[in-house]
Structure formats: structure tokens, C-alpha cells
């Protein structure tokens, strides 16, 4: 559904209201801003950087740019929570190559994550090669410039989130990994979890991620200031390689180019597949993303599986038990290190108690009968945890993490039958507006509440108006202004970005977008099992209601055959099975077949170039392109969604 942009005078960003100014002043009074330890640690060991820090693809397409963040040199403005402003300064103004200790280096703020570089006997061991090839290649080039040219001799992916692996082709080639020439080490279930998260639900996650990471916001005091987790997310070329060395159990040892790694499995915590590791040579513990200098997400607003806060706390505790008496340095995949055993262990134990407090108190209140919304209002950290900057809501929040713990144990339903079978948003919006005297009446009353600073309430009631009538200009305008004030007040960067992106979309309409497709790099690395799972998700039931067919696939580049069937409007696929009398048989390379199904090439082109051979009832494939849904990258979020079959 499309709708017209607001008139220019209504579409401009507004200043902070008096209520917002007072809210942010209260934060300034509450927290110990005189504590500068984080700034000292963030700048320690600096070697060099790129000036300006602008990374491009092909010389003209900008994929990452920190040159726009000079405004963060100033004092926090009224339009940014001062605590979040502090985190933004730490993330954006400390970029480049840093020595953690001799032989152990990090490139920070070339992307949302850090790339760690370890000097091995003959080359570089790379930990977490960022989100895009452009950023990882630039980070490696910076290290080679300042530390001397060395080849990459191993890659370690700490976990299954794209900002830690999708830039891998910027530091090695596909053949390096496929041949085993360069070890690529990852945790158990890495491939399945990486592709499940980034492919099966990839389109909806990517769309919501544009809100969470503020991709469409302009940097500035009324716009984007940080992601909280890092300075910004790179928007370059992504890829994927299948690891050739899988770590399965705590205590496993690997020696990579002469450097010993001692692994601890931390599955199902911050990511479904994750490990941390200790480096005895450096007395350094890499906590991956299990600890960071903020409260992380037990549930991420971009959408993902709810994480286990209790297991998360337990894994941090286990790290202290396993390595606490040996470590001198603690570093991670985001933010800055901590030096000194006592400092590092104190920090880790407070991170442990942060997640355990939220877990325990959520369930205490749930057992009294409180629902997730009531619990979120009541769970408050004790000052011993809440006044630590490394525990603040810069990414996750106590509010939405407590709701996540509730859902982890009890699901979305709160037991009240009124919420068991709800109406969809557009329909419920129309009925609320009718009951409340019509849209004009609702907007008039909402404006009074806006003037009183009741922004959460205004957002709730005006959402009903906009969902029932997105062309109601006064409602959209006031709702945009409301989201904006909520964003200005937010300490969480994702909350700020969600609110400000919602305001932008209400004012300017949907951004232009294309059809979602996996990248060629992802396609080449994707196992066939994951490809067929994705095709099953894309199958449109009404279109294939009468289809009953089987397809034998013979992969010319693999010792592998597959059987695919479509019946009952469901696609199933199995390896090492073939139908005796298939409807169709297709022979070709696995890469070409993946590229065809993912829309990166066509069957006609492959057949015409003799890369694909099709036999059997070829006519049964007529219209096959219509069987599978294509997903728009830019579906509406703050206005009614189109009804899909």
C-alpha cells in the first residue's frame, strides 16, 4: 500500500519538546559522566587509521563512512539522550588499528564489529572478518601498512551473525576455504544457523534491520548517531564460505599458524552457534559477543530467536571459572578491551549478574500472574548494576529483554482470552477509531496528550488511526512527531533508530526498494539443503494447489543427487534419493542450480549455454517462476501492509 508524503511544513524534523529536554537532563544528573575509564581504554594502543574513514566499492559507491560524525565532538544536544551520546562518541571517534598487546591487534569501527588480527608464525590469523568484503579488505590493508605485509593464514568465525562472517571474501577466496589451504574455524551448527537466520527469514529481518540500524537516517543530532553495538553498519558486498574446521566441545584446542586457541562453547546465548576462546600466549580471553560494553539483546528488535538469558549468565560465569585466574586481557568482537585481571573479572561478573537479574526477576513477577507488559514496567536494575555504563541500555533494554524472557518460557499469549484471537491491525484500528468518535476526534484528543508529554499513549492511539487510514494527514503528522520525541529520549540506539525511521516513513512514504535476493557470495556458499528450505518457504500454496511432481537433480560438481517433490502445496527435498519415474530430471552444477533458483540467472540462459540439461515432462515446468513468491525489500512497517496470499 502506498500513500502520499506529508506536506513539506509537516515533514521536517522537530526540536526536542520541553518534556524531552527535561527527560534528558534527568539522565545527565543520574549517571556518573565524570567516569572516563571507557574513553581511556577505547584509545589505548592506537596505531593508525584512515583519514577520512570512507570505504568504497569500485571507487564511487560508498559502503562505510565515518566522516559524517564530526558533530559528535560537541556536547550532547537536547535531541539525543546524553548517555547514548556518550556511547556514540566512544564508537565513532575511536577507529583504526589498535595494539591490544604485542602480536594481538584489532581494527575497530571499520564496520559495526571489530576485526581481530593475530600475528602467527607466518601470517595473520583473522578473527571475525566483518560484514562486508570492502570493510574487511580495508582493515587488512591498514594492518599490512602499519605492521608489515603478511598473508592470511587462518580465519575464525566466533558466531553465526553476519557482521562476523559476511566479509570473509575480503580476506580470503572461496577456493582458499574449499581446498582447505586456509583453515576456517567456526562453532558447531554455524552453517545451519547462519543461513537459517540470514536466508529463511532474511527479507523480513533485513527490512526490520533498516530500522534497527538506522540505515535510512542521515547522521546528525536529529537523526542517526550510533547503533550502540558499533559506530555504523557497512553496506557493502557480502559472502559466505563453508568452514573447514568445526569446534564442537568446550576444551578443544586448535593451533593456528603457531597460535594456541582454547575454546569454550557458548551455544544458544547471544547466538545459536557461538564460542569464546583463550589465547595462552597473550593471556587474553576473547569473549566474542557474550560480553560487550552495554546490555545486549535477549531479543533483538530486528527479529530473531529469543535467546536464553539464564544460559547466557551461566556461560559468562563459566568463562570466569575456566580462564579468570589466567587472563590479563579481556577483549571481544565489539567495543574495546579491558586490561588487568581484577578489572576484567569484575566487569564479566557484573555482565553475568545483569542477565541473571533480568531473568530471575522476570520469572518472579510472572509467577505472581503479571503479564509481560506489566513485568517490563517493574523490572529495574539495582544501582550496583544499572549505574555501570557497560550495563546500560545502549543496544538491548531491560524493558524489552524482560518481555523476551517471558516469551522464552511462556510464549506470546498472556493467558487472558481477550488476547487469544485478536483482530489484525487494520481492522482493529478501524473499530477503535469508530468507537472513539472518528479519526478527527482521536487526533484532537491525542494532541492534548502530546502537549502533556504522554508520548507512549499518543503512539498507541494514533497507530490505530494510521492503520485504518494512512491518508489521514493530521494523524500521520502527529504520530511522526510522537515517534520523534520517543526517539530523542531513548538511551537504546535501536529504539531511537526504530522511532526515527518510523517518523521518516510516516513523513516521506516508503523508501524505494527492490526484490529480495541472496547475494552471489551467499549463494555460492549455501549448502543445497538450505537452498531447498528457502524454496519451500517461498512456495505459494494457491498457485501450486494442483501441482504434483517430482524432480531428480544430478549435481555434476558434487558426489550428490537430490530429489525434490511438490504435493499438497508443500515442497520437500532429500539428498541421495531419486524418483524411479520423475516428472523431470535436471543435470547441472550445484552452483548453477543455486543461482537459478535464487534468481541470479535463468534456466533459459543455463540451457542455452549447455550448463543445464533438462529431460522428461518439460512442459510441467511451465510457469514455474510463478510458483515462488518474490519478496519486496521495502514493505510497510508503520502503515497497513498489503494482504498477501
Please annotate each region the language model reported.
Residues 1-89, 93:
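N-terminal pre-domain segments of enzymes
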Residues 4-23, 294, 311-374, 378-415, ...:
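Divalent-metal (often Zn2+) His-rich catalytic cores of metallo-beta-lactamase-fold enzymes
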Residues 90-150, 275-279, 283-289:
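Conserved beta-strand hairpin/beta-sheet module of binuclear metal-dependent hydrolase folds
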Residues 99, 123-125, 131-134, 148, 191-267, 311-323, ...:
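Metallo-beta-lactamase
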Residues 122-123, 133-185:
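Active-site metal-binding motif and surrounding structural segment of the metallo-beta-lactamase
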Residues 350, 418-441:
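TPR-adjacent "capping" and linker segments in tetratricopeptide-repeat scaffold/adaptor proteins
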Residues 445-448, 454-460, 467, 471, ...:
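Feature captures hydrophobic
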